[in-house]
Design a protein with these regions (language model features):
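N-terminal signal peptide c-region/cleavage motif recognized by signal peptidases
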Residues: 17-19
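Hydrophobic small-molecule pocket/channel-lining residues, especially in calycin-type beta-barrels
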Residues: 22-168
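Bacterial N-terminal signal peptides that target proteins for export
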Residues: 1-7
Length: 168
């Protein structure tokens, strides 16, 4: 009888611990709320190796407020024309990860999974290949940075660095 009581107590403890951890896991809405500061228009500066430039990006709630739509507009540089890009990002509670995917007017496309810890989103690229990562850091409600990805360019490895400020 004593052994059966111990087994039942162990099972009950495991169930209570499991339900407690499920309750502390952020909900989809909690996760989406953490990114609400992004909604609006941003002016960004970026460097990639020896290159530096500016661009604008805008975030808007879409698809029933379950997704954020991000648009980029990069001006023409050198021989390259302007580039427009559209991305969607949201939190998927089924896999406990953020997802982000989109395409550019120059035929580039990317897909990513991400995790958020406080004000930091760590993204891993999954399309077109599984290499590369980027870290988004919320500095304030009107400023964030992006560091990464790193990749080879003109015989050396470069890392992208972006600093964005929200417009008024």
């Amino acid at each position: 009888m004593h052994r059966a009581s111990l087994v039942l107590a162990a099972i009950a403890t495991a169930l209570v611990a499991r339900s407690g951890s499920a309750q502390t896991r952020p909900t989809r809405m909690d996760q989406l709320q953490s990114a609400e500061f992004l909604v609006g228009s941003w002016s960004c500066k970026h460097t990639v190796g020896d290159f530096s430039g500016t661009y604008t990006t805008t975030y808007a709630s879409t698809l029933g407020d379950r997704w954020l739509k991000q648009t980029y507009d990069f001006p023409a540089t050198g021989e390259d024309g302007p580039v427009h890009a559209e991305y969607f990002l949201s939190y998927d509670g089924r896999i406990d990860r953020w997802v982000r995917f989109g395409a550019h007017s120059n035929a580039q496309y990317y897909g990513m999974f991400g995790k958020r810890a406080d004000n930091v989103w760590s993204w891993s690229y999954v399309l077109p290949g599984t290499s590369g990562s980027a870290v988004w850091t919320k500095k304030s409600d009107v400023e964030y940075t992006v560091d990464g990805p790193s990749y080879p360019q003109n015989g050396k490895v470069v890392t992208e660095h972006h600093a964005c400020r929200k417009g008024s």
